[in-house]
Amino acid sequence: SKNDNYGANIRATLNILPIKGLKWENFVSYDKEQYETREYYTHYYPSLIGTNGQAYIQNYQENDTQYESTLNYSNIFGKHSIQALLGYTYQYTYSTSASMTNSGFDFDDNQTHNIGTGTNLTEGKASMSSNKEDNTYIGFFGRFMYNYDDKYLLSASLRRDGSSRFGDNNKWGWFPAVSVGWRINKE
């Protein structure tokens, strides 16, 4: 088996000076994974006796790209504390795979390097498969948090997410949330 993984992440933050407490953050990520598996079982492999050797090859590759951007605001005015967030996120994943299995080799010498010479291929018994998949996810989100005197708390958030994995008639969805809190021990 052979595995290769590559990845890179970049994060940048920009404090917007004219407005105290406002900052813009960005995150970019790329990840690539690929592997190849080659297996050969000789004529004498105990559970495969009579197959005249069996060869198996599988290749897989996946690329994943992500981007997220947020605008954050945080400030305190006397006993009032406010935090607000607006953001966007994007993710795209693309993968491919292929595999093949064949048996019935005259010799064990070539192993997986001449997989087409096995007799199961000419007899229609060899196994081959391939697959391609790509998925996209996009989200827009916002959150507002209010705190008065560290006693009374309010939080509200709203997301609008779209995904290629959602149902055909529901590619986008709204996801709201609200919470209220009271720290009774602060009274």
Which role fits each region the language model picked out?
Residues 1, 38-55, 96-127:
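Surface-exposed loop/turn segments flanking beta-strands in extracellular/periplasmic regions
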Residues 4-77, 81, 135-186:
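Surface-exposed extracellular loop regions of Gram-negative outer-membrane beta-barrel proteins
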Residues 90-94:
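Glycine-rich, aromatic-flanked loop segments that form ligand/cofactor-binding clefts
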Residues 95, 186-187:
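A generic secondary-structure boundary signal that marks alpha-helix termini
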Residues 131:
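Structured, solvent-exposed acidic/aromatic patches
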